[in-house]
Structures are given as C-alpha cells and as structure tokens.
Amino acid sequence: MEETDLTWHDSSVSREKRQQLMGHRGCVAWFTGLSGSGKSTVANLVDASLHAGGVHSFLLDGDNVRHGLTASPQMLATHGEEFASRFGLAFSPQDREENIRRVGATAELLASAGLVTLVALVSPYRKDRDAVRQRVGEQIGPQAFLEIFMDTPLEICEERDPKGLYRKARAGELARMTGIDDPYEDPLKPEIHLRGAEFSATELADQVVQELLQRIGREP
C-alpha cells in the first residue's frame, strides 16, 4: 500500500457537536521548560482545578508517555532488538523531534474530541514546538494552542533536582541533559509566561486556569 492509497474519513460527529456535549471547546496547553522547573507540578494542579470545575481535561506528562507512546529502546527490548531499534526513542535531537511529534499528534486528537489537553514536556527545541502549534492550528484553529513557558532559572532547577538528573549530568554519568550539555531554546512569544522562582505552584496554576477558561468559553 502506498501513501496515495490513504484517504481521510470525516467523522459523522463534528467537532462542534462534541464541544457542545462537553460544554466547552478543546485545546492544547503545552508546558515547556527545563527539568525541575515545575511543569508537571503546575500542570497537575491545573488538571485538578479544571476537573473540579467540571472541565474535561487530560494530562500527557513527559515521563508517563515515555513508558508507552514514546518508549525508549530499552523499554521495547522484549519486542526484539530490531523492533526496539526502529521504534524506540532515546534523547538524540532526532528522537526528541519524533517524541514531540507523537505527543503533539495525540494531543491534537484529544483536543479535537473536546478535551482540554495539558502537555508537560521539556520539549527543548523551538522548531519542534512550533510544528505542534502549526498542526493544532491547521486541524482545530490557532486559538486552540497555548505555549506555556515554565521559566525557572537553571540554578534553581539544579537545587531541586527531583530525579537526580543534574547531579548525574555534572558527574558525567548522563549525556544529553537539557540545560547542561544539550541546549534549551526559550519560547519567543509564549501565550503564558510563568516565572517559577517568583510565585508558588498554586499561584502559577491559577494563572493558567484563568487563561484556559477564557480560551475554552467557560467563565472564570
């Protein structure tokens, strides 16, 4: 079968009908920032707040998706070496790009179904984040994507170091650590700019919730 043999099939249930059933519009809220910046913490608080307010939401966390959707070659070893090598994703620039592409495509599908889809990934490269923005914009609309920059200084992220990754990177035990020997490209014009060193996680989550409620057509 060739790509030309594939045909897009429109659903008999439109996006508008799904949104009407949900009571709000779907969107993708993409949290990006260094490891330890607070992305997952804030995203989880946002998810809980939305759920408590009757908003249908779902969180795609970077570590969680690495256990399945974007699993590493090591995690796929039981499928055989060739399979693991072909489909497993490590942390090279190319693998990071595919990681973001897979998660972005999944997030777009969830948002199309009417869910407020929260994504918490380091996603260090600007072009990869922009590619997701473009995909969501083309499939749903430009207002359906929000880039949320979790702007926490590297020294604070290193002090927190909840997974011990910075310690390993500084000791030469871990390669391709974003912020140490792999670059992080700050967003140029994020929809929401969170300063992780200046506010509590709860305060930051409140900022995000207020913006999201306006975006999806719900009163704050």
Can you annotate each of these PLM segments?
Residues 68, 75-78, 85-90, 102-170, ...:
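ATP-dependent NMP and nucleoside kinases share a basic, alpha-helical "lid"
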Residues 59, 145-147, 191-193:
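Conserved beta-strand scaffold positions in the cores of enzyme catalytic domains, especially
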Residues 44-108:
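Conserved substrate/cofactor phosphate-moiety recognition/catalytic segment
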Residues 26-28, 56, 116-118:
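Residue-level preference for the first positions of well-ordered beta-strands
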Residues 39:
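Conserved lysine of the Walker
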